[in-house]
Amino acid sequence: MAVVIRLQGLPIVAGTMDIRHFFSGLTIPDGGVHIVGGELGEAFIVFATDEDARLGMMRTGGTIKGSKVTLLLSSKTEMQNMIELSRRRFETANLDIPPANASRSGPPPSSGMSSRVNLPAIVPNFNNPSPSVVTATTSVHESNKNIQTFSTASVGTAPPSMGTSFGSPTFSSTIPSTASPMNTVPPPPIPPIPAMPSLPPLPSIPPIPVPPPVPTLPPVPPVPPIPPVPSVPPMTTLPPMSGMPPLNPPPVAPLPAGMNGSGAPIGLNNNMNPVFLGPLNPVNSIQMNSQSSVKSLPINPDDLYVSVHGMPFSAMENDVREFFHGLRVDAVHLLKDHVGRNNGNGLVKFLSPQDTFEALKRNRMLMIQRYVEVSPATERQWVAAGGHITFKQSMGPSGQAHPPPQTLPRSKSPSGQKRSRSRSPHEAGFCVYLKGLPFEAENKHVIDFFKKLDIVEDSIYIAYGPNGKATGEGFVEFRNDADYKAALCRHKQYMGNRFIQVHPITKKGMLEKIDMIRKRLQNFSYDQRELVLNPEGEVSSAKVCAHITNIPFSITKMDVLQFLEGIPVDESAVHVLVDNNGQGLGQALVQFKTEDDAHKSEHLHRKKLNGREAFVHIVTLEDMREIEKNPPAQGKKGLKISVPGNPAVPVIPSAGMPAAGIPTAGIPGAGLPSAGMPGAGMPSSGMPGPGMPGPGIPGAGIPGPAMPGPAMPGPAMPGPAMPGPAMPGPAMPGPAMPGPAMPGPAIPGPAIPGPAIPGAGIPSAGGEEHVFLTVGSKEANNGPPFNFPGNFGGPNAFGPPLPPPGLGGAFGDVRPVMPSVGNSGLPGLGLEVPGFGGAPNNISGPSGFGGIPQNFGNGPGSLNAPPGFGSGPPGLGSVPGHLSGPPAFGPGPGPGPIHIGGPPGFGASSGKPGPTIIKVQNMPFTVSIDEILDFFYGYQVIPGSVCLKYNEKGMPTGEAMVAFESRDEATAAVIDLNDRPIGSRKVKLVLG
């Protein structure tokens, strides 16, 4: 069932296709769109089904050609009545609308003949009148003496300039319709009908030749006295019609409903009164000129502009003018992007609204190779886009050369500067308000931004905040209107990396804003000022700043401001730290207005910021400036502490072995009780190592100042006791080796005088602590060699795991090779040393024991120890740490470094630590190497060392191996990044 909907608000430029496009997707049968027009812009649409009508009603409030439309339910009866009413109005308009010469003196309308009606009947035959027409005219003249001006006026309204246009055959249809009323006019002479009996003499009528009336035509020439016709200009009802565009009836207010352009196009066969066709004739120019003296219909300046979208980027002004060929184009402005290239859009200014209306009809027509869209524009858009190029001409004296419709609204009063657009000046001052200036912007940057424009001297004002930094606001005053409009066209153009907003502002408004800014600075409270500076000018110790760390490296100011939402912070008070290359450091500094605000930010500690936990620390302004100058390395927990002998060695705080600084709990080890060395003063702790069955093996304590004296046994490290007496031997200096401790009774060893070994040590009985990581390999080699047995043979031999395959020579077996102990002749247990066979009941000792008793009795035939005892784990580097023994502790005077291995997984050696591997677990299966490198950003990861692990099917397991350049780097990474998320999973880091 067909349903009718009534549409109101249809613009005059819309047609049936626009309505169908508005209801696209709905079924409208052919002939289902009826445009009625009228003051409400009405149309009726017939839908095929109820569902289509229901969906169509839901589109009420939409826009057609930029005009909002309203939809109402209707019926076929209402539609037919409205169409019929519109048709009647249109037909009666031909008879009822006052004619162009109605204002002149003449007979009243009740005379039975309208001059408008007879105009077509007389004008078309004026150039070549027929005898019948002449007789009709003369008869009318004779029978109606009181209509003296009819024939003359009607003839006078058709000047010769009309040519044959009025005599075209198309008017033949109107001649009969107008001739019939002419036949009804002669009734006045009918009264003589009673004399009809005299008809017999009618035969004499034939002798009356029709030509004789032709001679009577000469009297017609008296028409020239029609000079009174020039009184036509005063007609007041015609201006709307004469101002009507050639095919643009809408602007004419008096037009009847149905003639507003939304109906059928104007034609010569649609019973339209020929008076409306005046604009199509040369007479139109006369009428338009005559309108110049009539100011009853001012033209809206916005009716002169159109916007063109989708033009080819190569289009030039000539291409646009060619596209609007036949129309009077005043100016063309092609819009450009910030680089200066055409962006495919433009604005066109025409000389009259008629041209604008015709230009809108060229919407979606082809320009070069692209279909462009033409839509209405406003004067404000023209000026904002750079219309100043021609705008000044149209306002100046040259504007008088343009048709009066263009200059009327601008010359109506001296205050022509006060126009409806908001981007124009409202008084003599040509001032602009700038927003978004870079904080480091100066006057020279503003001058360069407005280069080639005349700026009033000393008129540039850049606003600064209480902290002395620019707020991004500024003001500039120009000398003339043209430069002012050109400055407005710089809106959203770039100054450096920021685009600047240029807004118009009156001079009064500018001065008020500047005054407000100055008052704000003056009213800045002393308390707040004290937060920044104390009376002496020194930096205050109030903690009004925050140092945010462990944030993504791509963080921006806006991200930080969102993170601090709820705490008043200025954008200028946020500073994201970057390195020399402009890369983010994952840190930010924020300066708050009050100390309370700073303390509020502490509640955000460990809150998520773009997926990472942000660490918020409150600092003073002085600290903030120091951090800003020297940003700390991200993720380094250790502090640089000055240590004697090596002041630049980082000390890693931890709860591990005393002074060792290794972040772990106490590491078990096999205690090797140390025999105190003479002169040591305080015996050192025994060397822990893996558990070994049998008696404890004493180690050599690290001596203090060389002072001869009796040996003092050192305390044994805790551990499961092993039966058997402790064997004598030199104490082993250095850090404790991991493994369960096995104490045995310490057997005093010979007093060996010698200088103290400089460098690292372990806690002595006196309580002193020395950082054992501070001794370099160079320092360790300064003393004579200390030979210590290294390879204990036995069935329970073990060794550190081999390095992962495929990691190259840098991760080779770095087990230290123990130097030969030589043949000292000391009786004791047989110990195997690398490359030497150890005889039972014999222990090799230093050759310096020559004058000292060497036989300490018989011990067990052998003591099994794990091979490679003292060797370090893989990953300690190709150069293990060295510790020097006391002098004369070797077979010769030359240096003999001792290679001490640390506990598995930790670098206990000093000097140059080698590469270290970290095992990353519980990663997302889709993780990439780049994501892993980004996760460890800031740490010294060896390039190309990231190795993802796959199962036998080639599927990722979520694990990877990452190599770091040093042990410290790997340790710091484990401490800082363990349990941190990669994606949605928290990864586990295991030191390899």
Swiss-Prot record:
The keyword RNA-binding applies. Residues 393-424, 849-913 are annotated as: Disordered. It comes from Mus musculus. One of its GO terms (cellular component) is nucleus. The modification Phosphoserine is found at residues 352, 375, 420, 422, 424, 525. This is RNA-binding protein 12. SMART domains: RRM. Residues 876-887 have a biased composition (Low complexity). It is found in: Nucleus. The keyword Cell wall biogenesis/degradation does not apply. InterPro entries: ESRP, Nucleotide-bd_a/b_plait_sf, RBD_domain_sf, RBM12_RRM1, RBM12_RRM2, RBM12_RRM3, RBM12_RRM4, RBM12_RRM5. Residues 304-379, 430-507, 916-992 form the RRM domain.
